[in-house]
Design a protein with these regions (language model features):
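Mid-domain catalytic core of redox enzymes
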Residues: 370, 374-503
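N-terminal secretory signal peptides
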Residues: 1-15
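Active-site/ligand-binding neighborhood in enzyme catalytic cores
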Residues: 233-376, 573
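Conserved flavin/dinucleotide-binding core of flavoenzymes
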Residues: 42-77, 131, 444, 450-622
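N-terminal export leaders
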Residues: 16-31
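N-terminal glycine-rich phosphate/pyrophosphate-binding loop and immediately adjacent elements
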Residues: 56, 64, 74-251
Length: 622
């Protein structure tokens, strides 16, 4: 299918009008909930953050003040000083910040006054909940943090999950979701006309997967040059240890210090066109281009090439053991909030949390021990007289609150700007930890029948903005059920990052370029991309982009995955001297949580770091 002459008109750019009826769909929300939830659902349709569509994640209004008073170094405005002194102020209402408040209550007592500040209009940080109510039935999307890697839980995290009532075994048993690998053809590739000259869906193969999904037998269908096809055929056919002459230490050194694309070129014989097919393969798992990874990292992530170093790829081990809620780990954030502020919802359990409506008006009430103040951007933190002063902007005004203790549960890279009194070495370590960009675009479609007709539930898109897309059906819990065989409306998740320009050579330049591009793109650009892909992929199966796309929510995370150390770009730091270890050192009554403090982009890491940060405050004996 050729690209339409007037793509904007033919792609049916009408999402703005569709979004206007989103609130009308919410009127039916109470009808689909248990009676105890109706009262909480009815008064909040217009301002309920999880239902907001278009640009979410780092949404408009969540980052401009931070950029102005940190990156652009405008002087912080003179604040209005609020009289109340809190026992604890937490900066950041993500899972780590919420867990810090939870642990603080356990360490110091439930009566302690806690204020949690966050620059977003919703809590949860990257654990973002997307709700869709078009048509009256609620559909959930994962706006950021996906799942629980339960096999990595330490006793601290396990105890928290048990206290919240999270039953991993039950979650696993209720879920049949597998990132789109549940269709008749578990693996599929879609080549688009704009990049490759024609739209081409190829089922049964993958660029990253077990040996049975090798594209070798499908290469003649690829819309690429004959030269690239011949190179790929040789690459996939060759079975030889090309590093046989290297001693074990030299072999390890090569695998860790050689870029994957250099390996593909020098040992695999792949030219630029063939190599480019793999460029986006790690967007979802790493938030990076594949050429940023070493050979060892890329092969460990499932990219091809083991056959060139004398190893045989395994057919097993491709199942990723994880536990899911329908809104991802937003359910963990919501369980924590309901524990900290019971007034947000009644009778909350881990079983019912997916369908529970929250009263956001209850988050910041003076009578409560814990308060969550959203849309509040912290711009300065100082210590004086045994107290921490926290200055923030909300509604165009500056305020300052005082606290005995403060936990910074926000991105490390912003800390040097808002905590100017920190030691220079600590600020340098914090600035080092630049996050990896990520984008998750959730699209509600009228019916999943076109996917079923094509025999797919997911597909990789090597030429498009989002590296992959997949249906979100199959995660069921607590009254929320959207089975794999449900032919009705469904959420399609588009997952990936934004490729930097070729001119960005080093890693930091690439991350900066991707980050700036992500924030600069208007919603219409993401919308046009989604419609082009769904129209090209599903058009022959009867999908009409104007009729069948009901809503689009773009979760853009320019500061996404925590900075995990890379073979090609980070040195082997001495114990205790890694940037994240220096960055998280307690400074007076100030401690540091967030997954950055563990240099690991996982929910359990965020919880572990919250526990450590609060224990450091306990050790002050104040």
């Amino acid at each position: 299918m050729n690209e339409p002459k007037n793509p904007k008109r033919e792609l049916g750019m009408r999402i703005h009008r569709r979004d206007l009826i989103h609130g009308a769909g919410l009127l039916g929300f109470g009808l689909s909930l248990p009676r105890s939830q109706k009262a909480a659902a009815e008064p909040i349709e217009a301002s309920y953050p999880p239902t907001r569509t278009q640009l979410r994640g780092s949404h408009p209004g969540s980052f401009e003040a931070a950029h102005a008073y940190t990156r652009d170094q405008l002087p912080p405005p003179k604040p209005r000083r609020l009289p109340e002194i809190f026992d604890l102020v937490v900066v950041g209402a993500g899972i780590s910040g919420l867990a810090a408040a939870y642990y603080y209550q356990r360490q110091f007592g439930p009566d302690k006054k806690i204020l949690i500040l966050d620059n977003h209009d919703d809590f949860g940080g990257h654990a973002k909940r997307n709700e869709f109510h078009q048509g009256g039935r609620m559909h959930l999307g994962i706006g950021g943090t996906h799942n629980l890697e339960y096999w990595q839980f330490n006793p601290v995290v396990t105890d928290l999950m048990n206290d919240l009532g999270v039953d991993i075994k039950t979650l696993r048993a209720q879920s049949t979701f597998d990132y789109g690998r549940t269709g008749k053809s578990p693996y599929a590739l879609w080549f688009d006309a704009e990049t490759f000259g024609r739209d081409q869906l190829i089922t049964g193969c993958s660029l990253k997967g077990p040996p049975s999904t090798s594209p070798l037998l499908f290469l003649d269908q690829f819309p690429i040059s004959d030269t690239a096809k011949a190179q790929l055929k040789r690459f996939y056919t060759l079975q030889q240890d090309l590093l046989a002459d290297l001693a074990p230490e030299a072999r390890t050194h090569y695998l860790r210090t050689t870029g994957y694309f250099d390996f593909l070129r020098d040992l695999g014989g792949l030219g630029a066109e063939a190599r480019q097919l793999f460029s986006k393969s790690c967007h979802g798992s790493w938030g990076l281009e594949a050429h940023c990874l070493s050979v060892a990292e890329a092969l460990g992530d499932g990219l091809p090439g083991l056959n060139l170093i004398g190893e045989t790829p395994s057919e097993s081990g491709w199942d990723y053991p994880a536990a899911f809620f329908p809104d991802g780990n937003a359910s963990i954030a919501r369980l924590l909030v309901s524990r900290l502020i019971p007034a947000v919802a009644k009778d909350v359990t881990a079983t019912s949390i997916a369908t529970q409506a929250f009263d956001y008006g209850a988050l910041d009430q003076a009578a409560q021990s814990v308060r969550i103040r959203l849309s509040s951007t912290v711009v300065r933190v100082n210590q004086s007289g045994g107290l921490v002063g926290v200055r923030y902007l909300k509604g165009g005004q500056a305020f300052e609150v005082k606290a005995r203790h403060t936990v910074m549960a926000c991105y490390h890279s912003i800390l040097p700007y808002i905590c100017p009194d920190l030691p220079a070495e600590q600020k340098a370590a914090q600035a080092y930890q630049v996050k990896y960009p990520l984008v998750l675009t959730n699209v509600l479609i009228r019916s999943k029948k076109p996917f079923d007709q094509l025999g797919i539930h997911g597909v990789s898109c090597p030429g498009r903005m989002h590296a992959s897309l997949f249906l979100m059906n199959g995660i069921n819990t607590g009254g929320y059920e959207h089975a794999l065989n449900d032919p009705g409306a469904a959420v399609v998740a588009f997952w990936g990052s934004l490729s930097p320009p070729a001119s960005a050579l080093d890693l930091r330049a690439q991350l900066r370029a991707s980050r700036e591009q992500m924030l600069a793109l208007p919603f219409e650009a993401y919308e046009s991309e989604v419609r082009l892909v769904l129209g090209g992929l599903l058009g022959d199966a009867g999908f009409n982009v104007d009729r069948d796309i009901l809503a689009i929510t773009v979760n853009r995370w320019p500061h996404g995955y925590a900075h995990e150390y890379l073979d090609l770009w980070d040195e082997d730091f001495a114990p205790g001297q890694a940037p994240h270890e220096l960055a998280r050192a307690r400074f007076g009554n100030l401690t540091f949580a967030n997954s950055d403090a563990g240099a690991s982009a996982y929910t359990h890491t965020a919880i572990e770091e919250a526990f450590r940060a609060v224990n450091e405050l306990r050790d002050l004996r104040s």
